Amino acid sequence: MDEFKPEDELKPDPSDRRTGRSRQSSERSERTERGEPQINFDDIELDDTDDRRPTRAQKERNEEPEIEEEIDESEDETVDEERVERRPRKRKKAASKPASRQYMMMGVGILVLLLLIIGIGSALKAPSTTSSDQTASGEKSIDLAGNATDQANGVQPAPGTTSAENTQQDVSLPPISSTPTQGQTPVATDGQQRVEVQGDLNNALTQPQNQQQLNNVAVNSTLPTEPATVAPVRNGNASRDTAKTQTAERPSTTRPARQQAVIEPKKPQATVKTEPKPVAQTPKRTEPAAPVASTKAPAATSTPAPKETATTAPVQTASPAQTTATPAAGAKTAGNVGSLKSAPSSHYTLQLSSSSNYDNLNGWAKKENLKNYVVYETTRNGQPWYVLVSGVYASKEEAKKAVSTLPADVQAKNPWAKPLRQVQADLK
């Protein structure tokens, strides 16, 4: 069955029409027959200004732009409202406040940094001035020329007091030569003595012989490095009692060392004059001199030595004969000690080793098959000390050359050339 469509009503059905003339034409013909006037629609002119009947489509079309205009107007109104609402938000003054706070905080931070820099700078400058004041106030004058008794009692000398012995001297260097030459010997002033330290630089000052040599030099020096035992001998004033108390506290072994230092510069004169005679006389005189006490021997050698130097030679040979009795009585020695005593003091010997144990030192020398070695006893810090030497050489160069002939184990000990005057001073 066909569906009904609204367009079907508008379509004319051809079956309904009459055959032949149409209805309008029939009516028109009837009117003409009756004589009624007819209206010719073709002659009628219609004004364009007349309103035609609007159709539905035209109404819908006319309504659509109106709706669009209303929508546009509503959108414009909403946009205007939004603009009106947004403008106050942009014009708020709250945004300017945080900016001003930031600037304030930045300014405060800069001020704090400046204060810190100023404080640190002042703190760094302040200790320099205070330390200079402290050092200036803490300076003390030290006078080495003061009396030894004052140092023992804790009394410091006055800052302005000076002695005639410690006067300043001008130091002048020798001129430099254009060609290589040997070094000039410095001029020895009064009261001074040149000291040559033998051996390696690493262990030269630790060896007992060098220490004893420095102690001997210190005795002859003008500085108050030793106890004031010389003061009562020269002056004989009221400080004699204090000097005796100080020397009594120290061991008795140091007393001969001080008295020997007085004889040292004068002993070579006696030995040079009496070289041919005392070689044969010394062993004979040691036998009757053995019972002599050891305390009397230093006194006999120290007091008459300055007077007997100008007298005859046989009188001077008696003093070394008495001194040789003291080491022969209680000292431990090995080898020909007499050859060291009788040799000239200007000669040299080789010191191979030293120890506090005599047996170990003597056994080591025998183990190395050493020839012409001598072990003699001396003192070190108040205790017995034994020294091993070998050979007698006319010069220092010969002694150094002889080191190459020694065994390898002995050369490892760094033997060094030692003046015989030091050995002879130790044997006294």
Swiss-Prot record:
Matching InterPro entries: DamX, SPOR-like_dom, SPOR-like_sf, Vulval_dev_neg_regulator
Region (Disordered): 1-99, 149-190, 226-344
UniProt GO molecular function: enzyme activator activity; peptidoglycan binding
Biased composition annotated in UniProt, kind: Polar residues: 236-257
UniProt feature coiled coil, ranges: 55-87
Subcellular location: Cell inner membrane
Cytoplasmic side: 1-103
Disruption phenotype: Deletion mutant shows no obvious phenotype, but absence of the protein aggravates the division defect in ftsN or dedD mutants.
Record has rRNA-binding as a keyword: no
Transmembrane segments: 104-124
Superkingdom of this protein's organism: Bacteria
Function description: Non-essential cell division protein.
NCBIfam families: PRK10905.1
Domain notes: The SPOR domain binds septal peptidoglycans and is required to target DamX to the septal ring.
Record's protein name: Cell division protein DamX
Naturally occurring in which organism (per UniProt): Escherichia coli (strain K12)
